[in-house]
UniProtKB/Swiss-Prot annotation:
Protein name: Large ribosomal subunit protein uL13
Keywords (A to Z) from UniProt: Ribonucleoprotein, Ribosomal protein
Lineage, broadest ranks: Archaea, Methanobacteriati, Methanobacteriota, Thermococci, Thermococcales
InterPro entries, per database record: Ribosomal_uL13 (IPR005822), Ribosomal_uL13_bac-type (IPR005823), Ribosomal_uL13_CS (IPR023563), Ribosomal_uL13_euk/arc (IPR005755), Ribosomal_uL13_sf (IPR036899)
GO molecular function: mRNA binding; structural constituent of ribosome
GO biological process: negative regulation of translation; translation
Family indicated by similarity: Belongs to the universal ribosomal protein uL13 family.
Length: 142
């Protein structure tokens, strides 16, 4: 089991690395999901996520698609988009993923990993928004 600290990691790069680990059969736990960052212009990011959460079918709005508002679910959905979700292999890989806001008690004394290639300090122009800020904008709790 790998425990990854998402604090200061770029969401897309984190998601692609984690998706690869899941497909290789590893169990992955991500902590501090609200501190992962999405790079780009703040207003563009907010408008993109706001538009996604408003998507519904005209015939029956209860049929989806459904996009999350909580920060841990935003990270899970991003990783799901990088897995072959419609196959049995992809669904089994997705079940091996756990994402938490903050650090739960059971993982506080464990060694946390980070992904150096995905850290925000490697950006030349640091324009970014945290996943927690996006979740607050969408009306999520965390």
């Amino acid at each position: 089991m790998r425990i990854i600290n998402a604090d200061g990691l770029i969401l897309g790069r984190l998601a692609s690395r984690v998706a690869k680990m899941l497909l290789e059969g590893e169990e992955v736990v991500i902590v501090n999901a609200e501190k992962a960052v999405i790079t780009g212009n703040r207003e563009v990011i907010f408008s993109k996520y706001k538009q996604r959460t408003g998507l519904r079918t005209l015939t029956n709005p209860r049929r989806g698609p459904f996009y999350p508002k909580r920060s841990d679910e935003i990270v899970r959905r991003t990783i799901r988009g990088m897995l072959p979700w419609k196959t049995d292999r992809g669904r089994k890989a997705f079940r091996r993923l756990k994402v938490y806001v903050g650090i739960p008690k059971e993982f506080q004394d464990k060694q946390l990993e980070t992904i150096v290639e995905a850290h925000v300090s490697r950006l030349s122009r640091p324009k970014y928004v945290t996943v927690g800020e996006v979740a607050k904008f969408l009306g999520g709790k965390f």
